[in-house]
């Protein structure tokens, strides 16, 4: 099948769905300079706050999803998973192999997208599924709102390496992006997809501990959140294993090793591991 390269210097990026995730991605892309906002579009039906949010960035707001598909070279599904099927079948007549479809909808597999936008044709008495098959599945997480997403993508169908590089550049503007086989996405959901909530809980618990030890609430929360941010930066920037970084600050008989001892007695590692495994299991059940 012939490949139709996406024109890097002129392509239009369209979002089906104008929620918070789409907004955070658009802001990151526009702020990074990867793509000017006047080459990004979405559709807002009646929500004036959503319209204002996108127009304030400089994004073109169109009348409906069909207009977005017709206008765009790269179409991003950023809607709730339960409505992806209906939207995909609605826009199916407007698709061509020149368009790249990207889904950020949780739990929606590449094979599902391909099935929903395919056309069933009878050829020599044999039923064949034909039509659009140029897809990339992307899983960002909520820190995309502040440009610190942990994102994973998987190429499907006839998506090319060039398509992957393009999407990597776009989503890399709101954090870091990796490529992985789609079969790993349930585990990825359990780790990076649900992970921010685990860390929010940890920050809250650290702050509560600070309050219990006598700190004012505002100071405790500020120290807890900055400590988590700084520790994460040390892991990513130092290249050291987190275990080594932990050992570096755990002096014999000191305060840190006393705190670590309490965490280990309470099964801290196992609790986090079990949370990831449980969320991954639930993701498999829902998909």
What is the predicted function of each stretch?
Residues 1-71, 148-149, 211-213:
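NAD(P)+-binding Rossmann beta1-loop-alpha1 motif at the extreme N-terminus of oxidoreductases
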Residues 2-9, 225-287:
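NAD(P)-dependent Rossmann-like dehydrogenase/reductase catalytic/cofactor-binding core
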Residues 11, 135-136, 185-190, 242-247:
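Short pre-catalytic strand/loop immediately N-terminal to key active-site residues, enriched for Gly-Thr
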Residues 36-40, 97-99, 134, 218:
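Short acidic capping loops at alpha-helix termini that bridge into adjacent secondary structure
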Residues 40, 68, 84, 216-223, ...:
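Small-residue helix-packing motif on alpha-helices
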Residues 57, 65-77, 81-153:
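Rossmann-like NAD(P)(H) cofactor-binding subdomain of soluble oxidoreductases
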Residues 112, 116-134, 150-187, 200-237, ...:
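Internal alpha-helical scaffold of NAD(P)-dependent oxidoreductase catalytic cores
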